[in-house]
Amino acid sequence: MADNSSDEYEEDNKEKKKPSQLTPQQGFSENDDDDDDDSSETDSDDDDDDEEHGAPLEGAYDPADYEHLPVSAEIKELFEYISRYTPQLIDLDHKLKPFIPDFIPAVGDIDAFLKVPRPDGKPDHLGLLVLDEPSTKQSDPTVLSLWLTENSKQHNITQHMKVKSLEDAEKNPKAIDTWIESISELHRSKPPATVHYTRPMPDIDTLMQEWSPEFEELLGKVSLPTVEIDCSLAEYIDMICAILDIPFYKSRIQSLHLLFSLYSEFKNSQHFKALAEGKKVFTPPPNSASQAGDAETLTFI
């Protein structure tokens, strides 16, 4: 009897649970209907958008062409971002519109011709014959003439040069300093003189080439001739020019010019400056005096 009563109790509970389980399913079905309606509305909107945009362009991205690629899921997810992207449509106005510029280019200030007449009544033609505009620093006519002469390289043309004179120079040191600075700037900007050799001479770049290893090895054993050698100045010039592969003739002026030009190039070279600063001076040990005499070298730059 106890078993039958328990079975009946379980059957009653099952019958009570059935309607309670059916009710949420009905609620879900109603929500699903709403979702279906929303999805149908969005689909219709998408169709309208597709109709507005028209047919896909030729050569456009098609996801179906890349579905068969053997790639990982992360790469496939990256490909999905291409279809998710929607570019913004910006309408550009290409109409030409006339406008008045804010600024009008002009040389100096616009002359309003509002001049104060001279006390004697004579016309000064200011603004007509003489330029009338403000300037913080006027050019010196003498310095300007020197600049033009230097740039044109017309030094042999006879012309009337303006000589600047300064009254009461002791009371005007600023004008003297300005003149010195102007002439110094002129000399600093002066291009190097062009020299044409009458005899065949090698190029500076050729003379700056590295010596052969045999010659450098020889310089490590035999030092270069110094000024203490017993010879004349002409013979010493011939020896130095011969070591540096500079040809010399009866007149050694051109050879000396090329020699000092080579010296100037080495002195102003950034490469050799860095080598000279980074090179350590070798100090031989005190017990090897003979070895130090053999290894004595002289760097000629």
From Swiss-Prot:
GO terms for cellular component: centrosome; ciliary base; ciliary membrane; cilium; cytoplasm; intraciliary transport particle B; motile cilium. The keyword Transmembrane helix does not apply. Its main location: cytoplasm. InterPro entries: Intraflagellar_transp_cmplxB. Keywords: Cell projection, Cilium, Cytoplasm, Cytoskeleton, Phosphoprotein. Belongs to the IFT46 family. Component of the IFT complex B, at least composed of IFT20, IFT22, IFT25, IFT27, IFT46, IFT52, TRAF3IP1/IFT54, IFT57, IFT74, IFT80, IFT81, and IFT88. Interacts with IFT57, IFT88 and DAW1. Interacts with ARL13B. Interacts with IFT56. Interacts with TTC25. Interacts with IFT70B. This is Intraflagellar transport protein 46 homolog. It comes from Mus musculus. The gene is Ift46.
